[in-house]
Amino acid sequence: MPNLVFVTGNANKLREVRQLLGGAALPYPLVNEPLDLDEVQAASLDAIALHKCRSAAARLPPGTPVFVEDTALCFDALGGLPGAYIKWYVQAMPLCDIASMLDAFPAKTARAVTTVAYCDAAGAFHTFSGTTTGRIVPPRGPTDFGWDAIFEPAGEDKTYAEMDKDKKNAISHRGKAFAAFREHLCSPSQRPPPPATA
């Protein structure tokens, strides 16, 4: 039986995805592979994720189910920027500077979006998306997981970073995308065929 490969070298992301998928009776064992994939520059998160998934599938043995995840943080006042480029912003500048990009705007609203792109064992590609609306705030809580400390979901008084993991996973963009992915993985069409009998 093949493994279900999650392309990531990010230990925090792997831990969170294991939590999000862990309660399901997955058809394959989950492993990670830190492949270095080219990222296409595109406005569409689906296009970026599908490009990465196709690249990953081409580098793995045929029939290996593989998925990638891509996330965007879209500031409404900036027309959706930084969007899919948020991870480069996080690497290049402190979170307080990212939050201050909205200082000149009255609206601090934003959307957090995740797309999971999956290539199943038959070679078919699928995407699953989740969105959470909220607002950008000065950093609050631990700053060791991306931009969680500056995103406060709508209707909440805590940033993702201040929430316990179960609460965050229940309402987050990533949680929503992986709930749809988990449902697909557990569908009868995704079950591996039984071993051939002699």
From Swiss-Prot:
One of its GO terms (cellular component) is cytoplasm. Binds 1 divalent metal cation per subunit; can use either Mg(2+) or Mn(2+). Mg(2+) binds at residue 39. It comes from Eremothecium gossypii (strain ATCC 10895 / CBS 109.51 / FGSC 9923 / NRRL Y-1056). This is Inosine triphosphate pyrophosphatase. Homodimer. HAMAP family: HAM1_NTPase. The lineage of its organism: Eukaryota, Fungi, Dikarya, Ascomycota, Saccharomycotina. Keywords: Cytoplasm, Hydrolase, Magnesium, Manganese, Metal-binding, Nucleotide metabolism, Nucleotide-binding, Nucleus. It is found in: Cytoplasm; Nucleus. The gene is HAM1. Signal peptide: none annotated.
